[in-house]
Amino acid sequence: MSTATRSVAPRAHVLVAVKELHAAKTRLSGVFDTDDRTGLVLSMLRDTLAVVSDVATVVGVTVVTPDPAVARLARSVGAHVYADPAPVAAGDPADEGGTEHGLNAALAAAAEHVRRNESGVDVVALQADLPSLRGGEFGEALAAARTGGRSVVVDHHGTGTAALFSCDPEVPLDPRFGPGSAKRHLESGARPLDGHWPGLRTDVDTADDLDAAQALGVGPATRAALDALEHSAPSHCGNE
């Protein structure tokens, strides 16, 4: 396994995992009702997909999901869909912790599928809720990741994972998303990437996260969703 900078032209395939919409962003339930939260999740996904799809070194984007509405959105913007075969029913005890385990398994399978079909491609697992992401940030992170092996961009809280990279065909993606994922990824051998990429690091799980994203500036779909909901500055909620 080489850790030297690779000389071949960079090519990356981005995987974006989205759980079933009823289980998504439950920590925003004090700010938005279920329908509004669903609309916001889809809007943030749309903005995230638009940004990464425009990065020159990205040759493919796949959304990993069991949710048909998410799959429809993904296909409508030109992304591939890899179906997570194990959706979780509302109220199921696996709704929280089990969901992450299922999506990690689906991400790993999707990464293997991509590498079987696209020889030599770098694989990235990216959060779906990055409404402030900029293409330049993501391009810089990709370049930094290509110095070899498996690497991670830790989120703005310092505990979660915004993006996980595998830039060596011999190194599995080995996703370990879920609460405290940054520590698990680092302990499993991923190296931290230290660039100043605030939009890439600001994933949205709480009202405070949404405030932070809006301070950076959000993408057009997210902006339109927030304006329609008259929640352009929901700083009063602060769910944890």
From Swiss-Prot:
EC number, as in UniProt: 2.7.7.105
Task: Provide one Gene Ontology biological process annotation.
Answer: F420-0 metabolic process
Q: State the Gene Ontology terms under molecular function.
A: GTP binding; phospholactate guanylyltransferase activity
Question: Record's InterPro entries?
Answer: CofC, Nucleotide-diphossugar_trans
Q: Which reaction does it catalyse?
A: phosphoenolpyruvate + GTP + H(+) = enolpyruvoyl-2-diphospho-5'-guanosine + diphosphate
Q: Which UniProt keywords apply?
A: GTP-binding, Nucleotide-binding, Nucleotidyltransferase, Transferase
Chain sites annotated for binding phosphoenolpyruvate:
161, 178, 181
Pathway stated in the Swiss-Prot or TrEMBL entry: Cofactor biosynthesis; coenzyme F420 biosynthesis
Q: Does the keyword Nucleotide-binding apply?
A: yes
Query: Please, which domain of life does this record's source organism belong to?
Result: Bacteria
Output the SUPFAM superfamilies linked to this UniProt entry: Nucleotide-diphospho-sugar transferases
- Name the family: Belongs to the CofC family.
Q: What does this protein do?
A: Guanylyltransferase that catalyzes the activation of phosphoenolpyruvate (PEP) as enolpyruvoyl-2-diphospho-5'-guanosine, via the condensation of PEP with GTP. It is involved in the biosynthesis of coenzyme F420, a hydride carrier cofactor.
Know the name of this protein?
Answer: Phosphoenolpyruvate guanylyltransferase
